[in-house]
Amino acid sequence: MMKTLLKSIFIVGAASLISACSTPANREGEAGSSDEQLNIPECVVTAPPDSLGLDSFYVKYVNVNGLPLVSSWRVPDSAFVAAHRTLYAMTCMLKPEVLDAMIKAHARIAIMARYEGTTDIPEHRYLVNDTSLNWDLRARGLGGTIDEPLTSCAEENVLAYQIDKYHAEDILIHEFAHAIHCIGLMIAEPDFDQRLKQCYEKAKAAGILDNTYRITDKEEYFAEAVQDWFNVNAEMPHTDGKHNWCNTREELKDYDPDLYALLAEHFPETDMQISKHKKTNEIGRY
């Protein structure tokens, strides 16, 4: 889910892109799932540097290719390892100018602990005043935007706990896809949003989005497709208001070839297992 938030309170200097992203396995998306093939560096959790100027709520930190990944003390380090894997792989696949735009816009990611809510996240606290919706019940993740560049996700989804309300899909990939679109691509490729809109309107007119979450707007249309691309979306044999039969990259190619072609400009056709979630919708190890 993507919510346009009101303002950014985060001030930090732009960081440099980690050079490990330029390896062939990362840039070309060669098939494989091992850490060696992904070239993922060790995930070392530390305290956030003072230079980030973060709220005191955040006491854990990892740098992911120039993007801060943060949380309170309640989030286990294992969640950082899993989220770092996902985010490192995705950012290494991005065009350098897209990732650079995200870094300069101060994009960052926060992990909510299992027993924390959306409004516990400092940047999202103001949502407690929304009398139309209980955000702590509604959302276990929000996508970053230029106005509020923080993306949030939840421990139970990152680690694929059985109690996760979104157990059949990866919400971090969905929400970070919003940040890629609404921050990186909006800045680095000004025509991307219009091209995405054209794909969305065509798919909507064809009726293939009916009774699914994809039809909400072009932002959700994109984020759901990115989940498909990495084989981490939920699947239903018939549309149920949220999902349908399309939940993998292979199926997306048949379901919406125009959108597939657009995504192929930004993500490699990879079989990397970058999530605790698998396309069979079964919880599994890497």
Spans of model-derived segments:
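Bacterial N-terminal signal peptides that target proteins for export
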Residues: 1-10
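C-terminal motif of bacterial Sec signal peptides marking the signal peptidase cleavage site
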Residues: 19-20
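Short, conserved catalytic or interaction motifs in soluble domains
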Residues: 23
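N-terminal export/targeting leaders of redox proteins
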Residues: 26-30
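Acidic/polar, low-complexity intrinsically disordered N-terminal segments immediately downstream
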Residues: 31-37
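Acidic/His-rich structured neighborhood in mature extracellular/periplasmic domains
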Residues: 38-43, 49-59, 64-67, 72, ...
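Metalloprotease/metallohydrolase-associated module, dominated by Zn2+-dependent proteases
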Residues: 51-56, 70, 129-162, 196-286
